[in-house]
């Protein structure tokens, strides 16, 4: 059997044993149990308000309960230890059964609830809550709550600190569920704190005023270290050849200046009055190239002027036709 299935089986068996003890030992003031399986057998610790009624005359009742445990739940050699409850009013299981019996005997639910919760607080409990749900009066079921002191409803404290017990009152109109929650005296809650008056507190050392910002501003600037001084900065020294990041292309010695070919591209001039800049062409024959470029520029100027005159003439002809 898998581990998780074994855990479920153990929990189911535990709840069934608890119900069995509640039915058999209800009149003795059953207050809960603890089950521990050992190599020598199954150890069961019973808590009861009246241990004598659990044991019976000459141990007759306890032997009967032991035989039924072996037959019904297949327990190996169950050993029952009966312990008396020191304060029954602080045991939620016993209080719930008492309240259920009072309701069955005809007590009014408010009187029974207030009387029970007052007895719990008088016993020293930090807080208590009683919840009655069912047909307490009339044909409709409802929930009635009685609160005193401090109670935790959720979280780890509610599981570890709060003692909870349930009981059932069988009435003519139906059943009434009884739930009792009790925080026992001396419980350590996570939000508790204490204020100690007589405590020796070490004196706090005051910081001298000279250690503040004003003292730093008042110091001589020569005494203040220069964090950003240039002495600590090292500048890498580079040669001029390393700084210049240009690629120099040497001329081919096999090609003469006469064999070099000068390529001229047409210049697009997009306006009538635009200035035409002189175009510098770098070559070995600087004198001849300059004269050639100047002649080409003059020819372009003449062509531009001629085109401008033609445009003006066309515009005048168009104006005359319109007139």
UniProtKB/Swiss-Prot annotation:
GO terms for cellular component: cytosolic small ribosomal subunit. Residues 251-303 are annotated as: Disordered. Pfam families: KH_2 (PF07650), Ribosomal_S3_C (PF00189). InterPro entries: KH_dom, KH_dom-like_a/b, KH_dom_type_2, KH_sf_prok-type, Ribosomal_S3_C_sf, Ribosomal_uS3_arc, Ribosomal_uS3_C, Ribosomal_uS3_CS. GO terms for molecular function: rRNA binding; structural constituent of ribosome. Residues 270-303 have a biased composition (Acidic residues). It comes from the Archaea. GO terms for biological process: translation. Residues 17-86 form the KH type-2 domain. The keyword rRNA-binding applies. Keywords: Ribonucleoprotein, Ribosomal protein, RNA-binding, rRNA-binding. Binds the lower part of the 30S subunit head. Belongs to the universal ribosomal protein uS3 family. Part of the 30S ribosomal subunit. This is Small ribosomal subunit protein uS3. It comes from Haloquadratum walsbyi (strain DSM 16790 / HBSQ001).
């Amino acid at each position: 059997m898998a581990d998780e299935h074994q855990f479920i089986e153990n929990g189911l068996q535990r709840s069934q044993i608890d119900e069995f003890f509640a039915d058999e030992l209800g009149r003795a003031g059953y207050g809960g149990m603890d089950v521990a399986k050992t190599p020598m057998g199954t150890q069961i610790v019973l808590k009861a308000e009246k241990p004598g009624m659990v044991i019976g005359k000459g141990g007759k009742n306890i032997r009967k309960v032991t035989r039924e445990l072996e037959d019904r739940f297949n327990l190996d050699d169950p050993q029952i230890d009966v312990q008396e409850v020191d304060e029954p009013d602080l045991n939620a299981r016993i209080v719930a059964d008492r309240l259920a019996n009072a309701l069955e005997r005809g007590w009014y639910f408010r009187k029974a609830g207030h009387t029970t919760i007052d007895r719990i607080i008088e016993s020293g409990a930090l807080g208590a809550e009683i919840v009655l749900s069912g047909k307490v009066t009339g044909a409709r079921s409802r929930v009635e709550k009685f609160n005193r002191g401090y109670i935790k409803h959720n979280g780890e404290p509610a599981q570890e600190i709060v003692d909870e017990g349930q009981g059932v009152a069988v009435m003519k109109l139906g059943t009434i569920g009884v739930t009792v929650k009790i925080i026992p005296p001396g419980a350590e809650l996570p939000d508790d704190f204490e204020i100690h008056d007589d405590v020796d507190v070490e004196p706090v050392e005051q910081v001298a005023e000279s250690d503040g910002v004003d003292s730093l501003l008042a110091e001589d600037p020569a005494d203040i270290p220069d964090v950003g001084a240039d002495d600590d900065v090292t500048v890498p020294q580079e040669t001029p050849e390393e700084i210049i990041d240009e690629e120099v292309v040497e001329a081919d010695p096999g090609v003469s200046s006469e064999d070099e070919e000068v390529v001229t591209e047409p210049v697009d001039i997009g306006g009538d009055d635009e200035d035409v800049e002189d175009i510098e062409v770098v070559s070995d024959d600087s004198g001849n190239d300059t004269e050639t470029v100047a002649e080409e520029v003059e020819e372009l100027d003449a062509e531009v002027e001629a085109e401008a005159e033609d445009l003006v003439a066309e515009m005048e002809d168009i104006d005359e036709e319109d007139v």
